[in-house]
Amino acid sequence: MKRHAVWSSLFVVILAVLIDQGIKYLVESRMFYGQQIDLLPFLALFRTHNEGIAFSMLAWLHDGGLIAITLAVIAFVLYLWWTNAPERVFARYGFALVIGGAIGNLIDRVMHGYVVDYVLFHLPTWSFAVFNLADAFITIGAGLIILEEFLGWRRERISH
């Protein structure tokens, strides 16, 4: 992989981790557990903890199992990132966001035994699961990877 691709991806990973951990620090230090601060009619900060992974799944694995799974996922995504062609920019930054988000949540799990969640989308009769910025980075990263795959498929289809 080209040097520029490595450094720019590393920058995205570090920035994602720093932003995620900075916000989580503010939430943990300035909000009590279960506190909700409404920002917009449909958006609030709501401090909670997730002892599993997405949507509290696999909480029964406890810290050791969840840390092992997270490390395996990070290693796999690093492999995909490293073997990705540098000109596949959406995928490169997508992998970087997935890695940054996974590291952000891994830091929480190692330090606290849970992941700090705080973003709540809600309506008067409905609410979405509470999540954090690391989760959003992972989701956006996955979306960029899928976009890159779609664009590659489309380019290949047009060229034939």
From Swiss-Prot:
Its EC number is 3.4.23.36. The active site is at D117, D135. GO terms for biological process: proteolysis. Pathway: Protein modification; lipoprotein biosynthesis (signal peptide cleavage). Keywords: Aspartyl protease, Cell inner membrane, Cell membrane, Hydrolase, Membrane, Protease, Transmembrane, Transmembrane helix. It is a multi-pass membrane protein. The keyword Zinc-finger does not apply. It is an enzyme of class 3 (hydrolase). Pfam families: Peptidase_A8. The keyword Protein transport does not apply. The chain crosses the membrane at residues 6-26, 58-78, 95-115, 127-147. It is found in: Cell inner membrane. This protein specifically catalyzes the removal of signal peptides from prolipoproteins. PANTHER family: LIPOPROTEIN SIGNAL PEPTIDASE. This is Lipoprotein signal peptidase. The gene is lspA.
